[in-house]
Design a protein with these regions (language model features):
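Donor nucleotide-sugar binding/catalytic pocket of nucleotide-sugar-dependent glycosyltransferases
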Residues: 131, 146-224, 228-231, 239-243
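Conserved donor-binding/catalytic core segment of Leloir-type glycosyltransferases
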Residues: 232-257, 263-266
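Conserved acidic donor-binding segment of nucleotide-sugar-dependent glycosyltransferases
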Residues: 356-357, 361-368, 377-383
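Nucleotide-activated donor-binding/catalytic signature segment of Leloir-type glycosyltransferases, i.e.
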Residues: 273-278, 283-310, 315-318
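A short, well-ordered alpha-helix in the C-terminal region of glycosyltransferases
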Residues: 377, 384-399, 405-411
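N-terminal subdomain of nucleotide-sugar transferases
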Residues: 1-52, 117-119, 261, 266-271
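Aromatic "clamp/platform" in nucleotide-sugar-dependent glycosyltransferases that forms part
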Residues: 324
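Short hydrophobic beta-strand element within catalytic cores of glycosyltransferases
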Residues: 341-344, 354
Length: 421
């Protein structure tokens, strides 16, 4: 079987969750004998592994002015005329099935989906809500996407729009998907439910949770992990991951990742806990985070090494996932695989991963004070936290191995190919 993945890039120095998930899936599929390539806007790896989406050829001079026009009216992606030339590629012709991942970001024209899926069996893997909203990847508390969008309350949410044309974009997406042949894969039951409430409900929707390499993400002795990071063995250690704590567009703490809520929660810890607390940050901005929280921060910068991530997760007593929206919660799963319980919010699919009382706790509200309360409960009960640590690892190994995910995807691919025969 040959799979052609579609993503903005094949690899990147600071990889987001969707790209990390796709790369791990490709690796595990290869171990199952499945060949694959990536079709992308920016290729950073070898040509044998990835090809770039073709340009618009004779129409290339139209793309720049078309982009200016479409951006001005609030449409982000429909200027990419080269997307319609993808069927000319050898990689497309050789593929048995297409798998679309994270096709927003201005590199792919979703209006080409009907023609692309007419020629090939295709799967759409959901990493966020973008395919069925009027522009955003995370609708937060807005449910207008169920009715057609318009009057958008969050026009600056990623990917932002300069003008509210969200009803028009919603209709264009509905038109494009309505004329396409697809199977849909969702990583959480919450995402399955959301997709079924959208215009994607015309397609078969498969539940395939993300996987993790449990041989790499495995518990490291806390004393060893803390020594490696220069942390005193008797400290209370909290873990957090965010590429950068400040939103580069605004210069304030990243609200999408809940950095403002993390700051409030850690700042308000009781004195008897706070005096002995250290925060491990996988991401940029450790010094600033220390100033804002009032606790020492071990800032690791962006961590690309999975083994280094495993050390960071293992050093923590509790990992905090403060995001205001999660389609799944990949970093939570990585932490669990290392035997570290997770505290987060009841947002998206995160609660399914954490399983409150089993592998961590969910705060009672999306507030810094509620997050603080949940963290305190975890830190003050060593016996309960130790039980959760064992359960975290058991869940990761028994349900989320990469081989399990690969076999599930292979079945989706086979079912999709058979349905198109």
């Amino acid at each position: 079987m040959k799979v052609l993945f579609v993503h903005s890039t094949d690899q990147h120095a600071t990889e987001a969750g969707g790209l990390i998930s796709m790369r791990r899936l490709r690796r595990s599929l290869k171990e199952q004998g499945v060949e694959s390539q990536v079709l992308c806007a920016t290729r950073n790896g070898p040509a044998a592994e990835a090809q770039t989406i073709p340009g618009a050829s004779g129409l290339s001079r139209l793309e720049a002015p078309l982009r200016r026009i479409t951006r001005q009216i609030g449409l982000n992606d429909v200027h990419r005329l080269g997307t319609f030339r993808i069927p000319q590629l050898e990689a497309f012709r050789r593929a048995d099935v297409l798998d679309f991942h994270c096709i927003h970001g201005g590199f792919f024209n979703y209006l080409a989906l009907p023609s692309l899926t007419k020629h090939k069996p295709a799967v759409l893997t959901l990493h966020d809500m973008w395919p069925f909203t009027g522009h955003c990847a995370n609708s937060q508390d807005c449910e207008r996407w169920t009715q057609g969008c318009g009057r958008c309350p969050y026009p600056n949410a990623y990917p932002s729009v300069s003008r509210d044309a969200t009803h028009l974009e919603w209709r264009l997406k509905s038109w494009a998907f309505g004329r396409s042949r697809l199977s849909v894969v969702a990583p959480s039951k919450w995402m399955v439910t959301s997709a079924r409430q959208s215009f994607l409900n015309r397609f078969p929707i498969f539940y395939v949770p993300h996987g993790v390499d449990t041989n790499v993400f495995r518990p490291v002795g806390k004393a060893v992990a803390r020594a490696a990071l220069g942390i005193a063995p008797n400290s209370r250690v909290l873990g957090f991951a965010c590429t950068r704590i400040d939103d580069p567009r605004t210069g304030v703490p990243n609200k999408a990742k809940g950095v403002d809520l993390l700051i409030e929660a850690v700042r308000d810890l009781p004195d008897h806990l706070k005096a002995n607390t250290v925060l491990v940050l996988m991401g940029q901005g450790g010094e600033r985070l220390a100033e804002l929280t009032g606790v020492p921060v071990v800032g690791l910068g962006y961590v690309s090494s999975d083994r280094m991530k495993a050390i960071a997760y293992s050093a923590a007593d509790v990992f905090i996932s403060a995001s205001r929206g999660e389609s799944f919660g990949l970093v939570a799963l990585e932490s669990m695989s290392c035997g570290t319980p997770v505290v987060g919010f009841d947002v998206g699919g995160l609660k399914e991963v954490i399983r409150p009382g089993v592998a961590g706790e969910v705060a009672t509200a999306v507030k810094g004070s509620a997050l603080c309360d949940a963290v305190v409960q975890m830190l003050e009960n060593d016996v309960r936290r130790g039980r959760m640590a064992r359960q975290c690892r058991e869940i990761a190994v028994s349900e989320h191995g990469l081989d399990i995910q690969a076999r599930r995807y292979m079945q989706v691919y086979l079912d999709t190919i058979a349905a198109c025969a």
